[in-house]
């Protein structure tokens, strides 16, 4: 219940940002810039079965997003992303390059799917939409709030009691860095790498102890993460708000 309340408050805050942008855009003579886009890349799980980023754990993911510029530097963004999750204890390597004892002992693997709805703010270092400027690219940073639904299954070759399939609905804090390039007045390319800090340890259903066992088979104090890296294409819309002519007529009278 608390997670749901936090999620609603978070999205309410993001929604207020979009509302403020709409109000500001009504200033006569102001130019509103917005984008819609699609992206594709890889989704990576990080948790008990993959304690660090592993390139081989990348699984297909797609995203659709909407951006609205609040200023030349600040952009509000909402996005929907879906992808697959995979991990295997046998792919983990320790400092000596060998399979860590815990991973070998547990011998588990995970698979599943994840759907995320997010909103947040991008900070652009350059105004790459300004066609009068020679700079048509910008690096940016992003931070926001996300709600996600994950349906995953974990199986262990050593502990049948670990086998579990289930779903999780929770919150995450997405942070990312990226790069945008304006191909033309309307078309843009993007590259982004980001991480999502979740508030659950249930993506892999391993909470620190095996079911029916007293052995430690995970870290009960380490919550799960997931990461996204990908490319995107977006289309920019421009709108210039002209002064209301009715106001001028009223003044002449």
Q: Where are the language model's segments positioned?
A:
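Extracellular/periplasm-exposed beta-strand and loop segments of Gram-negative cell-envelope proteins
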Residues: 48-55, 85-116, 150-170, 202-209, ...
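Residues on the lipid-exposed face of transmembrane beta-strands in outer-membrane beta-barrel proteins
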Residues: 38-40, 64-68, 119-123, 143-147, ...
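Short loop/turn motifs that connect adjacent beta-strands in outer-membrane beta-barrel proteins
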Residues: 25-33, 72-73, 127-137, 185-186, ...
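Short glycine/proline- and aromatic-enriched beta-strand/turn motifs that initiate or cap beta-hairpins
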Residues: 24-68, 152, 228-241, 253
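Transmembrane beta-barrel architecture of outer-membrane proteins
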Residues: 57-61, 114-118, 138-140, 170-174, ...
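Gram-negative (and chloroplast) outer-membrane scaffold detector with strong preference
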Residues: 72-155, 237
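Bacterial Sec-dependent N-terminal signal peptides
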Residues: 1-31
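Predominantly the C-terminal beta-signal and adjacent terminal strand-loop region
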Residues: 184-253
């Amino acid at each position: 219940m608390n997670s749901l309340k936090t999620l609603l408050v978070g999205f309410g805050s993001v929604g207020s940002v979009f509302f403020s942008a709409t109000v500001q855009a009504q200033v006569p003579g102001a130019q509103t810039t917005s984008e819609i886009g699609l992206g594709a890349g890889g989704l990576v799980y990080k948790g008990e079965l993959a304690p660090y980023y592993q390139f081989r754990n990348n699984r297909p993911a797609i995203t659709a997003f909407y951006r609205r510029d609040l200023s030349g530097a600040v952009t509000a963004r909402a996005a929907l992303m879906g992808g697959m999750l995979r991990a295997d204890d046998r792919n983990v390597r320790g400092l000596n390059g060998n399979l860590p004892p815990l991973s070998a002992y547990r011998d588990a693997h995970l698979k599943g799917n994840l759907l995320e709805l997010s909103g947040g703010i991008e900070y652009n270092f350059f105004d790459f939409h300004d066609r009068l400027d020679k700079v048509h690219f910008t690096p940016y940073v992003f931070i926001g709030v996300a709600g996600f639904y994950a349906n995953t299954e974990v199986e262990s070759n050593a502990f049948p009691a670990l086998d579990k399939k289930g779903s999780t609905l929770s919150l995450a804090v997405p942070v990312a860095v990226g790069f945008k390039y304006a191909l033309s007045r309307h078309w843009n390319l993007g590259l982004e790498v980001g991480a999502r800090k979740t508030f659950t340890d249930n993506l892999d259903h391993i909470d620190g102890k095996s079911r029916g066992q007293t052995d430690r088979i995970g870290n009960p104090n380490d919550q799960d993460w997931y990461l996204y890296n990908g490319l995107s294409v977006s289309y920019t819309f421009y709108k210039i708000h002209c002064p209301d002519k009715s106001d001028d007529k009223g003044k002449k009278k």
